[in-house]
Amino acid sequence: MPWALAVLAAAGWFESTAGAQTPQIGLAPTAQQAAQIPVVPQARFVVLLDAAHGGSDAGASLANGQTEKSFTLALSVRLRSLLAARGIQVVTTRESDAAVDPNRRAEIANHALAQACLSLHASESGSGVHLFASSLSPAQPARFAAWKTAQAAWVTRSLALTGAINAALQQAGIHVTLSRTSLPVVDSMACPAVAVEIAPDHAAASQTVHSDLDDPEYLTRVAEALAAALIEWRTEAHPL
């Protein structure tokens, strides 16, 4: 890495990929971290799955003793399998019950040069799936972007991705709520990024539809809808 980029990286800046023909992230990880970052061919369509929490951070307490960290990991594994079956390359921030720093999660996403990034969460409150896009104001792509607001150049694309996911979930009969908020992990991602929080679908509770977080059929329905959205996203926005 050139000396100037190293100085900018140390100050919390990196070389933005937004709008670049050959994107190059300028954030310099340590040698140990670099060895753990997946090497992804730039020509491939790549999805980043971020299973929230992990390790000593269990996240929210869910029904029947389940934890948010275990639910998000199970969803990540299921979704990865569905996408891989359709030829989509998937990079994950964790594949086990491991603690991952928020900055590290964003770092993995930015080095993966992903075309879609999903941060996966779960909660017993709310109903159905809550989609969160960053509340940052859209900004024009710049050669260098502040790490904590890297998402600003991608907000418009993130809102489009949110719309695609919303359509697929509703097509599957799952209630959806749309919001915008500030999430450090998402705000630092230089890619179309959406936080996806799954809750029991109370809107479907009176129907013959499985809708609890501890029901594997509900997990499958959500995963299949998310996969359908990402497959459509690849077809319409990023054809191979």
For every predicted segment, state its role:
Residues P2-A4, F45, P102:
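Generic alpha-helix initiation/capping and coil-helix boundary signal
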Residues A34-L48:
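N-terminal hydrophobic or amphipathic helices/low-complexity stretches enriched
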Residues P23-Q32, Q36-P38, S70-L240:
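Active-site-proximal helix/loop segments of hydrolytic enzymes
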Residues R44-G65:
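Short glycine-rich His-centered loop
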Residues P2-G12:
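Bacterial N-terminal signal peptides
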Residues V7, T17-A18:
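Cleavable N-terminal signal peptides
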